[in-house]
Amino acid sequence: MEFKLEAHRIVSISLGKIYNSRVQRGGIKLHKNLLVSLVLRSARQVYLSDPCPGLYLAGPAGTPAPPPQQQPGEPAAGPPAGWGEPPPPAARASWPETEPQPERSSVSDAPRVGDEVPVATVTGVGDVFQGGEADATEAAWSRVEGPRQAAAREAEGTAGGWGVFPEVSRAARRPCGCPLGGEDPPGTPAATPRAACCCAPQPAEDEPPAPPAVCPRKRCAAGVGGGPAGCPAPGSTPLKKPRRNLEQPPSGGEDDDAEEMETGNVANLISIFGSSFSGLLRKSPGGGREEEEGEESGPEAAEPGQICCDKPVLRDMNPWSTAIVAF
């Protein structure tokens, strides 16, 4: 009875601490981590205090099954066949070999009978190959040099005809056909006003505005700088992009609401861990409230292993219970 009262007192104190810890930064998360570690400590104490831990392993939910025992007649379980072996070599058909090895040896032995004939044959093949390369090179150069030579001939013919037909050559130099020096074409009356040439440069006010200079992406933030699209003006000093923290006010109320919502999850966490270890704790001789004490105990909890120091039960424990004890 005294043990249960002490467990109730520890639970109430711990729940009060958890409820009051929401005013601290990260307090509720810290207590959740402590709950997880203390639940495992309580499981260790239960396993050490239970005289026959192997009989109650089927009780908790989510307990991994121990590895199956091997029969003496069965071979040892090992990695699957082919594990760790290098891949098989590629087939010979994938390699670009046109002749098998015996034919190569016969070809290499053939020049011994008549040395001059194979050499001449190989030389002729090489000459034909080199001649084909030369023809291909000349054809490529003719394609490139042909338009250049034609353009040069046209330029020379035009330069030679300037002295004979100066007006025609000048008119040919402009795509619109307007004379260069401002002279009127022949046959035009003197009273006719001279029309402006479409090729002449337009005045400055008719020119469209120059496109804005491309600025780096870092400087193109909206509202920064005096140029278009956020770019700095030509004569202005580049400004730094304002931090987003200044634009968005700190939301302290949302954090408080989140922490208040998290306080409701403490009971769910306790119930989850309690259901997972309920099969062990109900059949343990220590009492029914050992689980709650282990979950909610703070600094007042006793050190693990003090309950069952005089019970040698480690010899018949399976790997799952051994792992919990090692924790």
Curated annotation (Swiss-Prot):
Record's protein name: Immediate early response gene 5 protein
Compositionally biased residues, Low complexity: 71-84
Function in brief: Plays a role as a transcription factor. Mediates positive transcriptional regulation of several chaperone genes during the heat shock response in a HSF1-dependent manner. Mediates negative transcriptional regulation of CDC25B expression. Plays a role in the dephosphorylation of the heat shock factor HSF1 and ribosomal protein S6 kinase (S6K) by the protein phosphatase PP2A. Involved in the regulation of cell proliferation and resistance to thermal stress. Involved in the cell cycle checkpoint and survival in response to ionizing radiation. Associates with chromatin to the CDC25B promoter.
Keywords annotated in UniProt: Activator, Cytoplasm, Nucleus, Repressor, Stress response, Transcription, Transcription regulation
Gene Ontology molecular functions: identical protein binding
Segments for region (Disordered): 59-166, 227-313
Record-linked InterPro entries: IER (IPR008653)
Keyword Cell membrane recorded: no
Compositionally biased region (Polar residues): 265-278
Cellular compartment(s): Nucleus; Cytoplasm
Major subcellular site: nucleus
Signal peptide: none
